[in-house]
Amino acid sequence: MGVVLLALPVLLLVAVVAARIYFEHYLHSEAFRKSLGEAAAKSLNADSATFAPLEFDGGTVFGENFQATRGDGGAFSSLDADQLRASFDWHGLLRHTVQIDEMSVQRLNIEPPAAAAVEAHTAQSLSGAGPAAQGPLDGLKKGWTVDLRKAVISEANWQWSDKPGGGITGTALTLIPNGPGAWIIDAQGGTVALAGWPELDLDTASMRWQSPTLFINSAGLRNGASRLTVTGEIETRKAANLQVKFDGVDIRPLLTPDWRERLTGRLTGQANVDAPLGNGNAARQLTVSGSMALTEGVLTALPILDEIGTFTHTERFRRLELTKASADFTKSPDRLEVHNLVVESEGLIRVEGDYTVVNGQIDGNFEVGLTPATLQWIPGSQEVIFTDSHGGYRWTPMRLTGPVAHPHDDLTSRLVAATEKAVIKSVDGVEGTVKKTGQGLLDLLMH
């Protein structure tokens, strides 16, 4: 018995060494690399996943490349990772588990699925068919599993859409598991691009993935002096609901080419973005609603203002510096609705109203207010047109219709008619004394 007791530690040591040798041999085998690829493919819901030959140094493994492909229209069509390095716990191998304490990736590229595949995948999901959604690296129920404790990606490039184009490039990611199917994700740096919008630099983003939804706790973006803060959630292949606060956003890139020469300034406000995902009509169903104010605003070469400037001999109308400009809005791909619009150059003019733009055609109803001092240069205007008085302005309604680039108003014609009538009456001695500019306005109308 004593001999057996003395030999037992030796036998255990031999068994441990033999097991270590066996596992080391197995880890270098093609069978293990294939099993690891199958585990990763299952976790990613991919059709295939392959690792380049792996190199081991104690508890650290190195790999040149990892690739995964997916053709069912899910989260990606291809995933390509370069320069992988992982530290793992040997004890997990006894449980058929690859326990990775930390994995680092130098570069990760993710390409979006084709539009047709996305539509087919969405239809299958809505019908209840197909496999249930999994979080990244949730593991297998049988065979080998992957237990990733932390992932650090130095450079991630993710194209999430090709029609319209959109994605993020050059961002650094840190991912930490936070329960079954859940991950805490921190992002830093990189550039966000979306077709039709200026590029934005990402400062930082704090997010949480809980399959199948990405929760954005906070994301800070900038473009020059522009600053945006984004919160909200994105439910995979269903919908995105985001809240955006913006400050100092240059308005010109958001305008049509004709208006970029007429209006300058910076936007401040907030907006809600609702976007369906996973179908070919998603881009046509996007809606944005919110409120905004324009600071440092300047209106230049607006026809109606030029006309008022001509009538009043006031050059300030030709380059109107705005002391206040604000509105509520709802924007969809084929329609813009603006309510509670207020545009004012204090002591000169104030405009209030609502309008819609559909298929490039504007239809709006406004109230235009001018100061009595300004209107004194327009004979008959206060008696016939600007008849209402409040808030330091004399007011009249105005209708604006036609192409957005060259709209038509009904105020100019009324000003012309009223002024002509007043000047003619003055010449005939009916009206009495009128300011000398009346004759100048008559000359303008006749020539």
Regions found by a protein language model. Name each.
Residues M1-L44, G429-V434:
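N-terminal type II signal-anchor transmembrane helix
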Residues M1-L6, V17, G278-R284, R316-F317, ...:
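Extended terminal
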Residues G37, L44, N65-P180, R262, ...:
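Secondary-structure transition motifs
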Residues E38-F66:
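Short extracytoplasmic
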Residues A46, G73-F88, Q159-L175, W197-T204, ...:
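Amphipathic hydrophobic-ligand
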Residues A49, F88-H91, V98-I100, I216, ...:
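Glycine-rich, small/hydroxylated-residue low-complexity segments
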Residues I153-W158, D186-G190, T213-A219, L336-L341:
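Transmembrane beta-strand segments that form the barrel wall of outer-membrane beta-barrel proteins
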Residues G166-L214, R260, S291-R335, T374-H406, ...:
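Beta-propeller and related beta-repeat scaffolds in trafficking/envelope systems
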